[in-house]
């Protein structure tokens, strides 16, 4: 009986291991800066340190504003959790570049991007690494993370840019 299960394991594992692996992902044209496309701007915001929902944490965050943004018209908004990995113009995702290209082609509406990293608790010793709050923020059941965005981050962004309050104009990923 054990040989039977071992044979099944080998039968299903070997083809998977022998299958050719994908080469590294090649960025498509929408991930490349196009000289003819107006480029939005990425603003690194001051570290967020005054959270009432996640007290004691500090986090880095950025706002992307498309070139087509007009202050008199509410923009859609998309939040990127683990935002530091998505906001880099030369990184693996290049979201600001993709947004620039898709907005310019009319394939997506004018959308402000909020790129936010999970919080961390600073240490008293600068040599120590801060304790991450990522798992608590992203993996906990409940409404804390949604409330953090709706009650703290969106109002802060709305002090500078007009963003939609329509749920159909909001998205989150990461």
Enumerate the predicted regions with their spans.
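Non-catalytic cap/lid and distal C-terminal segments of serine-dependent acyl enzymes
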Residues: 19-174
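Positively charged n-region of N-terminal signal peptides that target proteins for export
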Residues: 1-4
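Bacterial N-terminal signal peptides
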Residues: 6-15
């Amino acid at each position: 009986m054990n040989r039977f299960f071992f044979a099944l394991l080998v039968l299903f594992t070997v083809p998977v291991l022998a299958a050719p692996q994908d080469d590294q992902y090649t960025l498509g044209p929408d991930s490349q800066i196009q000289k003819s496309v107006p480029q939005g701007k990425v603003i690194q915001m001051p570290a967020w340190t005054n959270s009432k929902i996640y007290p004691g944490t500090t986090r880095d965050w950025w706002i992307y504003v498309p070139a087509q943004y007009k202050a008199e018209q509410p923009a859609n908004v998309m939040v990127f959790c683990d935002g530091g990995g998505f906001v880099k113009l030369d990184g693996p995702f290049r979201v600001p570049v993709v947004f620039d290209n898709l907005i310019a082609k009319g394939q997506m509406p004018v959308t402000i991007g909020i790129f936010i990293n999970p919080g961390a608790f600073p240490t008293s010793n600068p040599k120590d690494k801060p304790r991450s709050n990522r798992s608590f923020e992203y993996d906990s059941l409940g409404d804390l993370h949604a409330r953090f965005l709706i009650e703290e981050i969106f109002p802060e962004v709305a002090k500078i840019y007009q963003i939609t309050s329509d749920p159909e104009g909001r998205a989150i990923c990461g």
